[in-house]
Regions:
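Alpha-helix initiation/capping motif
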Residues: 25-27, 66, 70, 143
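Conserved PLP-enzyme active-site core in the AAT-like
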Residues: 6, 15-22, 89-206
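N-terminal glycine-rich, Lys/His-bearing helix-loop that initiates the first secondary-structure elements
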Residues: 5-61
Length: 206
């Protein structure tokens, strides 16, 4: 269903895509139906296992066995966001800050270090400055306008550079190309909170 929608508007402009992407040609509805379900019904345990195996082999989604793996509604949303961000895949979370938490903890482990832009969203600062140290993870805040200090603060323990562009508190813009270049040179992951930029103004992956 959503694949048809995505392919149909692949060549359209950003604004055209936003206006038409939600059309549900499969069910002939103006917008995809909102599916609210916690339990998915199957005819047998064998069918459940088949669906679970498909989900494992296809991490991009589209196969559901329980609410935690999403519904057809969340799948369509992920496909749309993937197109807007021009990314390989999008994984949705319950909250925006939940995605920040997931991005950080999917990379770092006890004993690691991360570098965070100084004008970062305050809850992100609280998380990285106060809570990460309980897991023996060190946070260093860097000046986004002095990237020489960013390079100097990278150590063999550094696993992630966390960026906001623009920054939440000051709305200053950072040189993403230079930051990514430094990260690649040192084999460090990068993550960005793109809340303010949105894919309309900023496509960090591109």
């Amino acid at each position: 269903m959503s694949t048809t929608v995505i392919k149909f508007f692949m060549s359209k402009s950003f604004r055209t895509f936003l206006k038409h992407t939600a059309k549900d040609f499969h069910n002939q509805s103006v917008n995809p139906p909102v599916v609210r379900a916690s339990t998915i019904i199957f005819k047998s345990m064998r069918e459940i296992r088949k669906m679970q195996n498909k989900a494992i082999k296809n991490p991009k989604g589209g196969y559901f066995d329980y609410a935690r793996s999403g519904t057809s509604t969340t799948y369509i949303l992920q496909k749309i966001l993937t197109k807007l961000e021009e990314s390989y895949h999008v994984f949705t979370t319950q909250t925006g800050f939940g995605s920040v938490f997931l991005a950080i903890f999917s990379v770092v482990r006890p004993g690691d270090e991360i570098l965070v832009a100084d004008p970062v969203y305050n809850p992100t600062r609280v998380l990285t400055e106060n809570y990460l140290k309980e897991f023996n993870i060190k946070t260093i805040f860097y000046d986004p306008h002095n990237l020489e200090t960013l390079q100097k603060n990278i150590t063999p323990k550094t696993k992630l550079i966390f960026v906001e562009n623009p920054g939440s508190n000051t709305f200053d813009f950072q040189d993403l190309n230079k930051i990514i270049s430094i990260a690649k040179k040192n084999k460090v992951y990068t993550a960005i909170d793109n809340t303010w930029g949105t894919p309309y103004y900023l496509k960090p992956i591109k």
